[in-house]
Amino acid sequence: AVCIPLGFFKAVKHNSWFDNGTSVLIFMGYAIPGYVLGFLLILFCAVKHEWFPASGFTSIGFEDLSLSGKVTDIFYHSVLPLCAYLVSGFAFLTMLMKNHLMDNLAADYMRTALSKGIAYKDALRRHALRNSLIPIATNLGHQVTLFVAGSFLIEKIFDINGFGLLGFNAIIDRDFPVVMGVLMLSALLML
């Protein structure tokens, strides 16, 4: 929801202070691995400032909470792992949107549309933006697969019992049928 508008404004305002400043932040987010970012988030947000819990997916006494309390508790515990999971995907999709929109802005059909007298904003929205969304839609399935399959390092750091941690523990315990099942399911999700 943020990647498309941010990539759009970065392409429209190319080489401005906004584009250069956000590019630095985006490349930092892309360069930092998710498990390192998770570790830094735990140190800063959980240990130093105690804003969020450091580990687990639920609090002690979760069963005694009401339905709204359970939803709030799960949301509260999932903020840091989600940030660690999604930052690199966010950076990748933002730069993908920017680069494809810039390619489409320089395409012949944009020059043709502008020479026909269509306003620049209309040509941008009707022609360039629509064609730039195709790679985003193509890559979205890959991002969802990575999110569902999980990162066993992030799940290990945050002590979340998920799909990635199941695969990690199966490798450590040499449980080859579970390893094969995890790999097969991950491969099916990638298709």
Predicted regions and their residues:
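Alpha-helical transmembrane segments of integral membrane proteins
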Residues: 1-18, 34, 64-191
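Juxtamembrane transmembrane-helix termini
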Residues: 13, 46-56, 98, 102
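Membrane-water interface segments at the C-terminal ends of transmembrane alpha-helices
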Residues: 25-55, 84-90
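Peri-membrane helix termini and adjoining interfacial loops of integral membrane proteins
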Residues: 48-63, 155-161
